[in-house]
Amino acid sequence: MRLRKIWLLCNLVCIIPGAFAQQFIHPGVLHSEKSLERIKRLVDQKAQPAYGSYEILAKLPEARADYQMKGPFEIISRDGKYGYTKGPSERDFNSAYYNALLWKITGKKAHADKSMEIIRAYARTVRQIPPTNDAPLCAGLQGFILVNAAEIMRYTYMETHYPNGWSEQDTECVEAMFRKVFKPVLSKLFQTAPYTNGNWGIAVAKAQLSFGVFLNDRKLYDDAIDFFYHGKDNGSLPNYIAESGQSQEAGRDQQHVMLGVSCFADMAEVAWTQGDDLYGALDNRIMKGYEYIAKSNLGYDVPFVKWKDITGKYSHLSTFGKEGMGRFRSVFEIAYNHYVLRKGLEMPYTKIVLGLVRPEGPGFTCDNTGLGSLLYYLGDDLNTGKDRGRIEEDLTQLKAWNFSTASYRAVNGVMSLVSSGVKLQKRVQYDSSAYPNIVVKAPGIPASANKKWLTLSYSISAAPESWEFDSDKAMKVGEDIYVFKITDVRSKNGYSFSKALTNATMTLDFGDTCGEPVVI
């Protein structure tokens, strides 16, 4: 009898190939049900930096439930005759994704319906990505954003629960779009002799991996992972990031470097959601790529070797590329939260970068999702342990500041703000009645700096008001701590600062420091 059972089991496996193959997790491209619940919980708790990233998302035009779709287009392209569709279709795909996220965060059906409207419109309409030069980037980058939106809606807004929800017809139509319009473009790049910089192959691979999940197509998924490890292309991991962390494109502008390495992180996060660890590949090679980017773009010296790329076309890049240096994209949270908060490793230079860019805003066009402080943050609320409404800023920590007019980099081995006009801003909550003293620790302000470098501002009756503080009148504690009293100043129109807990903008404007760095 026992032998008969074994014989029957063997025959069952033969009759149903893949019957015991690992099933895909849904929703499960970038976001599992568990991760979507975590995102909502962080927003409900107003936990920072996630809530700050959410506030940025909620204000984006593409995130509105009444967003006016620019398409759909029968043909989408990044260049050539139909290149005019690039911007509009990118905004539409981002809108589908943002509204899908906001549906899960807020529970508002208007966001779900907007996402469904865009997904359905393109699934019914788009029929081609023409074979122009940039076709792989169009299918890879834009396809990745759209499939993430579709995955969320397919498994969280079904017609069995909502009148306008996802139906079997939607499944057929959307799957057909991805298979017939997007997938052939991806496949063509894999089948063609290598001819591009590495970010192309990585963008294509992350989209194919994601389509594999959405389409429940194990071969698509496995082929993408095989390319990740073994692809004879600049876009495979060993061919793109060296053991030192230097990338194949490190001699180009730094935005392409950030695109390439962050696409690996996107790909690794999709695989992680499915139970596969690409993050750990080649001794955490993606982490090393991030640390190299962070360290070099902060102004530290890094090793650089002339790269012999797979195509032979780009081996002339003999020095580190300084174009775009220090302009950090919103791509750092995803890797930091995995390696540091999931795995307990250290990323000291990426940590510094996050001090500059948190909360992360949206991605650049469809290159990445951005918003990582909302989507991937796994740490404690940064407000925990702080007295609500108190302003005590330590510039040596440099958390959550936004500065478009200052570059943060190492000067003679010391981290400094350098620019012809150093200006930083951040959003704060201030309770002037409970905490009349505003404390700022600023270790190295040049003598040539603007004396009235601290300002608080908010609107009264829709009119902007600002309170300006003179550092010469501040109480000094030691050489680097300034204590300003809110009761000593009035706004330019004579108002006292509100005694209620107030959302305000805090600005540090050091002005033209004659080339001297603001050492922090």
Residue ranges and their predicted role:
Residues 494-508:
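Noncatalytic modules at the cell exterior or secretory-pathway interfaces
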Residues 175-204, 208-218, 227-236:
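Extended amphipathic alpha-helical interaction segments
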Residues 410, 415-493, 509-518:
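Extracellular ligand-binding interfaces
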Residues 21-194, 248, 273, 278-391:
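Extracellular glycan-targeting catalytic surfaces
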Residues 213-304:
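Long, repeat-rich segments with strong aromatic
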Residues 386-407:
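Extracellular carbohydrate-recognition regions
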Residues 139-142, 201, 257:
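An alpha-helical repeat/solenoid feature that recognizes helix-turn-helix modules
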Residues 1-23:
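Bacterial Sec-dependent N-terminal signal peptides
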